[in-house]
């Protein structure tokens, strides 16, 4: 039977206006419940699918101890996914059905994870780019969330994501200091940077954030979060001598993207077309998923499905 949140929208707004956290269904309205379920699902799905994505690339680790570091990160990601799914279970969601019985295309996570990571270079860049995106998003939720159980759980998640970032940045610095490694790193960065720019979703001009911001599902808009991410990534890449199509504009005090965005992407070749397209075309690509979607989800569901 569907769990019904008992509060009205006005009661929830009054509860939040008083500075109180939402601790469970007893404090939720149907609209709040729908929203928090959605953001928890996106978060948990993202953490879960990162595991097979990272494991694929970890096979290219240069040494056994490096493989061990990658596996430690994967274990963290699975634990983070468990937090999200466990909270969804508390909110009336059938966890086994959600994880093991959904079709692959129904999973909600950034398109970037549908593109295979085929080298150690791409794994450490994923730690430096994708995990930075995750850190920006979850730090915003940690600071702004009105859902108490998740807010408290994210204190641990933030600390572990810092390790993932450090792992990626340490390797990027090491590779960038060697001309041969740097060239291979740059080749992967060329497709991964722009793909991570998409991570934060539609631009503010095309997306309404009303309920998300009002109910504290997030504290910043998509464009603000994208700016935060560039604020971490662009200076770092400049520091190590890697090229990214973005720079800080002193006049506007904002980061500016120096390439057509969004643009066409060839998921098989991992190449950008260089021609600007509309966000409606990007949405078609996102909804159609990418080449690894079914493979990764099948791997995650294999033990359950037999």
Q: Which residue stretches match the model-derived regions?
A:
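Glycine- and acidic-residue-rich phosphate-binding/metal-coordinating active-site segment common to enzymes
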Residues: 144-196
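Conserved alpha-helical segments that form or flank metal/cofactor-binding pockets of metalloenzymes
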Residues: 2-11, 73-101, 168-173
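Internal, conserved structured core segments that host functional sites
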Residues: 115-167
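Extended, helix-rich structural scaffolds rather than catalytic motifs
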Residues: 183-306
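Extreme N-terminal leader/anchor segments
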Residues: 1-28, 32, 293-306
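Acidic/His metal-coordination segments adjacent to aromatic residues that form catalytic metal sites
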Residues: 21-41, 101-127, 144, 178-179, ...
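Helix-loop segments that flank and shape redox-cofactor active sites
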Residues: 50-72, 134-150
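Alpha-helical scaffold segments that form or flank carboxylate-/histidine-based iron centers
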Residues: 32-43, 61-80, 123, 149-161, ...
